[in-house]
Design a protein with these regions (language model features):
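Solvent-exposed loop/turn elements at secondary-structure boundaries
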Residues: 102-171, 188-231
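Surface-exposed extracellular loop regions of Gram-negative outer-membrane beta-barrel proteins
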Residues: 8-35, 46-99, 171-174, 182-189, ...
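Short loop/turn motifs that connect adjacent beta-strands in outer-membrane beta-barrel proteins
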Residues: 19-26, 62, 96-110, 127, ...
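Conserved small-residue
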Residues: 128, 229, 243-341, 468
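Flexible, surface-exposed loop regions and adjacent strand-edge segments
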Residues: 1, 42-50, 82-88, 129-138, ...
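Surface-exposed, low-complexity loop segments enriched in small/polar and acidic residues
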Residues: 1-11, 25-27, 37-39, 44-46, ...
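Extracytoplasmic gating/loop element in the C-terminal half of outer-membrane beta-barrel translocons
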Residues: 282, 313, 367-455, 459-460
Length: 474
């Protein structure tokens, strides 16, 4: 059958610009916008209404101030919580226009600025595909078996508790910026230090509620949806460019870098398992202590039957972190950053050389500080699956002193195939991401044609990887 999708949108904008006494520069902007989208088969229309104001002022192109304020409305929240204000403020100082730098032959431009904002957003207010009425409780009914044959009883139970105080997710940002140009743009630099915090992500099964408020069968819960989890990103980024003409060749070398730490707030039963203060892309698993060498060593070690099967010599030995003489999920710890939200430090280097109608361009990228886990079918050879070359270094009685891979078995080998530091490797790498040579045909060839220009180029991508784990990464 057919479906209907209707979107109505409105936007209006008012701008103001003026200069007073040649030194006071003022501009302002007022924006109103809204939209409503309705789809067949969906009860609730997707609506948004926003009003924003921005005012900018600078004195003699030296001192800058910018203030913004957005008023937003969201139908995803309960009445009384659907409106919010999102302010922002930026302050800047252009040092180049001060008397002590105005006539400098070294500094072309130099500016420092600081900015901060608190943004209320509802984009992430969702539980699965459900975005509306998350603040309401849900009750439902079902049938179950009665106490006597041939009958069933109807019962009513809660699926979710009520929370009419559910609020917007807040994005708090603070940044300090520095920009400069030196020696007639021979060197340019743009650097920033930033702190970004996302506060109030939704959770529906918080660990600080008693477990009896949530049951597995029937799937009942009195727990409401709460604003609870917080994510924080702290770091710096920079971009430096060097531009020089050497004879007939125009050279440009650029270097960019980003370093950041991402952290989460979350509670767990064991304190060392708390995600609070740990990386958002953290790898969690077991600490290994080598391979078991004998039955006597297994008997003298904490019980590892949690993973199933029988532990034998050649299996991975794990560390009993909480000291309860057994290995289970409560012995998992933070092992390192996975780099899924970006490596702790990323680097980019680009080189451009222009000579007559030829242009040479090369781009190199690097990422450092993250870890990976060797957990695909090449490394985790289970049961009678096809073996890879890595198992040549497996544990046997003859190779126990040099083995780098656990024993082989056609039975349950789950003990060995758990996320642990035994399988981890550094993903540090520098890659020659792109090389391109371009030739621009002379413009004189197109003076009497409809063509404005024509270029031909040859390029290559991912031509080289420099890494201690190059074979794994490739």
């Amino acid at each position: 059958g057919s479906t209907d999708n209707q979107t109505m949108f409105f936007s209006g904008q008012f701008n103001y610009n003026n200069t007073f006494n040649d030194v006071h520069n003022l501009s302002a902007m007022l924006i109103a916008s809204g939209f409503q989208q309705s789809k067949s088969g969906q009860y609730h229309k997707n609506s948004s209404a926003n009003l924003a104001f921005d005012a900018s002022y600078n004195y003699a192109q030296k001192y800058y101030a910018d203030f913004g304020l957005a008023a937003i409305h969201s139908a995803q929240l309960a009445p009384g919580h659907r409106e919010a204000l999102s302010p922002s403020l930026s302050l800047g100082w252009r040092l180049k226009n001060e008397s002590f730098l105005k006539n400098s032959k070294v500094v072309d431009d130099m500016m420092i600025s600081v900015s901060g904002s608190i943004i209320n957003e509802d984009i992430d207010l969702a539980s699965g595909d459900n975005r509306y009425y998350l603040y309401q409780s849900i009750w439902t009914s079902d049938y179950g078996y009665g106490w006597y044959d041939g009958s069933s009883d109807k019962y009513t139970y809660s699926k979710r508790g009520e929370n009419k105080d559910l609020d917007f997710i807040k994005r708090k940002e603070l940044s300090l910026n520095f920009k400069t140009s030196l020696w007639q743009r021979l060197v340019t630099l743009d650097a920033s230090f930033f702190i970004n915090s996302m506060e109030g992500y939704l959770i529906s099964s918080p660990t600080f509620y008693p477990s009896h408020l949530n049951t597995g069968y029937p799937s009942a819960s009195f727990m409401p949806v709460l604003n609870y989890n917080n994510n924080r990103r702290v770091g710096f980024d920079f971009a430096a460019n060097f531009n020089k003409k050497v004879g007939d060749v125009d050279l440009s070398l650029g270097v960019t870098g980003t370093s950041k730490a991402t952290k989460r707030d979350e509670n767990n039963v064991e304190q060392y398992q708390n995600r609070q203060g740990k990386a958002l892309d953290g790898i969690w698993g077991y600490k290994s202590a080598g391979l078991f060498q004998s039955e006597e060593e297994i008997k003298a070690s904490p019980d590892q039957s949690y993973f199933g099967g029988t532990v034998k010599p050649g299996d991975i030995k794990y560390v009993d972190v909480n000291g309860d003489n057994k290995i289970d999920q409560y012995d998992q710890v933070f092992l390192g950053k996975g780099g899924w939200y970006g490596a702790p430090f990323t680097l980019g280097v680009n080189l451009t050389a222009k000579w007559k109608n030829f242009t040479f361009f090369a781009l190199g990228t690097g990422n450092f500080g993250a870890w990976g886990v060797k957990n695909n079918s090449y490394w985790w050879v289970k049961g009678d699956s096809k073996y890879s070359a890595v198992v040549r270094n497996r544990w046997t009685e003859e190779t126990k002193e040099t083995a780098t891979y656990p024993r082989l078995t056609t039975l349950n080998g789950n003990n060995n195939f758990q996320t642990s530091d035994f399988w981890m490797y550094k993903t540090d790498a520098f890659r020659l991401a792109k090389v391109q040579i371009t030739y621009d045909l002379p413009s004189t060839l197109f003076q009497k044609t409809w063509l404005k220009g024509l270029s031909a180029y040859v390029s290559g991508a991912n031509l080289l990887t420099i890494s201690g784990e190059r074979e794994v990464l490739e």
